[in-house]
Structures are given as structure tokens and as C-alpha cells.
Amino acid sequence: LVDVAVKSNANCIKFQTHITEKEMIKSNITPGNISKKTLWSIIKNCELSEKEERKLQQYCKLKKITFLSTPFSIEAVDRLKEIKMPAYKIGSGELTNVPFLEHIAKTRKPVILSTGMSELSEIKSAVKLFKKFKIPLAILQTTSIYPANYSDINLGVIEKYYDIFDV
């Protein structure tokens, strides 16, 4: 995947950092029509060990492409901090997790904030938190439907975000 990104002239590649035991309670919940496997087993199967993640980050460095990852727990933030990740990408499902957001803000690293599953009031609260800590911030209009229909993409909200948040 890294090699394909480099070949495509990407300057950054983003992964996800899951430490399943720290981000969810083990249960038999299945994600509807996507899979018959439990959500726990799907996430656990996608999890990279700390050693694997360090190896991936080092490979990105060798290939001169920026390594980023979306953490899903405070422990994942700490792991990424140890490998000196330059910024944090936050998934829209985490915008209401204030202790998590504050933990990221305390790293003093720039933040890329997804908004797909969030209400405007939730986005405003998260932006206010990062501005309080004077964290460089990028706000992404994202659509949390895969694949997304063109009618659901709502690119017009980007201008609204620009006006509201002055970013």
C-alpha cells in the first residue's frame, strides 16, 4: 500500500491505530448487512501490533512519505506520540469524546478533524477545544456512507465551515 501511494506521488498515507481492548467492550454485535462477524472480531483483525506499526512508520520514512494514523483510544494516541507522528487525524465518531480530544490537544500536534457523523454543535465544541489549546486545525467535510451517493456528499458545507470556523 505504501509503495502504491509513493508511486502515485502521494506525500502522505493514513492508517488506523486500533487497540481493540481499549476502544470497545467485547460483544456479539454485528455491523448489519456488512458482515456476519462481530464488530469486535473485525476491528481486532484490522489491529496492528505496536511493532508492526513502528515497522510501517519506518518504511514510510524510508520511502519519504508522511505516516499518519487515526487513533481510536487514548492508548493509541500515546503509541503514536512515541513514534513522533507529526499530526493526528480524528475520526468523526470521536468528536464527542472530550477526554480523548483533550489528550490529543495536549500533544500540541496539528489536528485533521473529520466531520462525517457529527452535528454542527459537536463540530463547534471540538473546534473550540482545539482553538483553546492553540492547535493548528484542518476541518474535513467527510461523508460516512461507503460508497457515498453524489447527492449525499454535501460539498457546499465546506464554505459554511469556512465562514463559521475561520480556518
Q: For the regions a protein language model found, what residue spans apply to each?
A:
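Catalytic cores and adjacent flexible loops of soluble metabolic enzymes
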Residues: 1-167
